[in-house]
Curated annotation (Swiss-Prot):
Protein name: Membrane-bound lytic murein transglycosylase F
Gene: mltF
Entry remark concerning the domains of this protein: The N-terminal domain does not have lytic activity and probably modulates enzymatic activity. The C-terminal domain is the catalytic active domain.
Transmembrane segments: none
Annotated organism of origin: Actinobacillus pleuropneumoniae serotype 3 (strain JL03)
UniProt superkingdom: Bacteria
GO BP annotation list: cell wall macromolecule catabolic process; cell wall organization; peptidoglycan catabolic process
């Protein structure tokens, strides 16, 4: 009997030990598996982000960015409210995800094997790579061994685990970190020659080159990797299933394509000379006419009206083309008479008439076209005529596309110059390929003005707070050297 009791006690103790070992895991699993239910119960989706010019920012028109638009759509998909929580860097963001302070980490984060062991991942929505950058005209680095101590990165950057892994095969690799500058600010410091090298994500570098064209890529630090959301870790998660379902839905409905078109497509074309000339004009010429663009902007942002005028005339009120169009907005004589202006070379008259004419065209665009795309339809009509815009909408429908989807319409613009297509259209031949490029150029110019202003304002603020480059990121400083 004593032996039986002893065995029972021993067995019970073993059971308690096993329960103690398993219970925390069960608790964790319970919490993770219920994360989706928690979101539904509180009716709030908490998404962690880092302020960033492509991912998440608050601009003149309100909150925007790739991650914001995706997260907002996901919250709508779940029928809950979106709560954005911002962090200074990726390290803080992942710490918050681990501590259950956010439900999703969304900050233009590339897939990393180390992180996938700690967190669940969602579907990829674009891909990018880490690259080493230097100032155009200075010594270009070609390999890791040339970076010794001269590489500056932000503290808490997502690239740190990558550098630590690379150091295993490259023992001389070293870098310095700074708490005082963001990744974008370090890219700009490279452009100004204040620091020799930094790293950035390829799409961020492309965006930065449109405001600082002397930023150049030395070499790829990594291969291209998917950009995705990170979720709390567990062996199974309803939240992960919901994210995967949403991303499939976003692909099928064209949401991902529309977001890529909005934030990425205008970055594909990079002309060093053109951008240099444009940035010079922003500094020297634009201030003369900015008040007029603001005065006559109507429903547009004044920066958009300025971008149109630059595409038309490079902000030259006396510009003339061989076809007879003249002035800041390059108006035809017929359009000038229609808009009741007497002097096409008057900057004010031309800007006013051009804006009013564009607004008139946009009012004719069907209400079924989404609000954010109406400007692109209007610009295409401004360039080639409203009749040809109607034609390309008809052609898009004939070819199985959606005439209310700018992505579908714009790819068919060049077809207006092909006889097999224009011969069956009401308004016939049009130089649709020019209209396509016209809209793309304006998108690029508009983005550059917005980003140039944002960077200038940030630099003024930084100069007031920090008049010189802090010692913490100077080459002489050893206090921040990280291995």
């Amino acid at each position: 009997m004593k032996g039986l009791i002893a065995r029972f006690i021993a067995g019970f103790a073993l059971l308690l030990w096993a329960w103690d070992m398993v219970f925390p895991w069960q608790q964790l699993m319970q919490a993770e598996e219920n994360r989706y239910n928690q979101i539904q119960q509180r009716k709030i989706l908490r998404v962690g982000m880092v302020n960033h010019p492509l991912s998440y920012f608050i601009g003149a028109e309100g909150t925007a960015g790739i991650e914001y638009e995706l997260a907002k759509s996901f919250a709508n998909y779940l029928d809950v409210r979106l709560d954005i929580k911002t962090f200074d860097n990726s390290e803080q963001l992942f710490s918050a995800l681990k501590d259950n302070k956010v439900d999703i980490a969304a900050a233009g984060l590339l897939y990393q094997p180390e992180l996938s062991k700690q967190f669940q991942i969602g579907s990829a929505y674009y891909s990018a790579s880490w690259q080493v950058v230097y100032k155009k005209g200075s010594n270009r680095p070609y390999k890791l061994s040339e970076l010794e101590g001269d590489l500056i990165i932000p503290a808490g950057s997502a690239v740190l685990p990558i550098l630590q892994r690379l150091k295993e095969d490259n023992p001389k690799l070293s870098w310095q970190t700074t708490n005082q500058f963001t990744q974008e600010e370090l890219l700009l410091q490279v452009a100004e020659g204040k620091i020799p090298y930094t790293v950035g994500i390829s799409v961020d570098i492309s965006a930065a080159q449109h405001i600082r064209p002397n930023i150049a890529v030395g070499f790829d630090l990594t291969d291209e990797a998917p950009v995705l959301w990170y979720l709390p870790n567990s062996s199974y998660s309803e939240l992960q299933a919901a994210v995967l379902d949403f991303m499939n839905h976003a692909n099928e409905t064209g949401l991902i394509s529309r977001i890529e078109e909005k934030y990425f497509n205008h970055l594909a074309h990079f002309d060093y000379v053109d951008i240099q000339s444009y940035l010079k004009a922003i500094k020297l010429v634009l201030p003369k006419y900015q008040s007029l663009f603001e005065k006559y902007r109507g429903d547009l942002e004044w920066q958009m009206l300025a971008a149109i005028a630059y595409q038309e005339s490079h902000w030259d009120p006396n510009a003339t083309s061989p076809t007879g169009v003249r002035g800041m907005m390059m108006l035809t004589r017929d359009t000038a008479e229609r808009m009741k202006i007497t002097d096409r070379t008057s900057a004010e008259q031309s800007i006013r008439a051009g804006s009013e004419y564009l607004h008139m065209l946009m009012r004719q665009i069907p209400e079924t076209v989404p609000k954010e795309d109406r400007i692109w339809y209007g610009l295409a009509a401004y360039n080639m005529g409203f009749g040809h815009l109607l034609d390309v909408r008809r052609l898009t429908r004939q070819l199985g596309g959606n005439p209310d989807n700018w992505l579908d319409v714009k790819k068919n613009l060049p077809l207006l110059a092909e006889k097999r297509h224009y011969s069956g259209l009401k308004y016939g031949y049009a130089r649709g390929f020019e209209a396509f490029q016209y809209v793309e150029n304006i998108r690029r110019y508009y983005s550059s003005i917005i980003n140039h202003q944002r960077v200038e304002e940030q630099q003024i603020q930084n100069n007031e707070e920090q008049p010189s480059v802090p010692q913490e990121i100077s080459k002489e400083s050893d206090s921040t050297l990280k291995e």
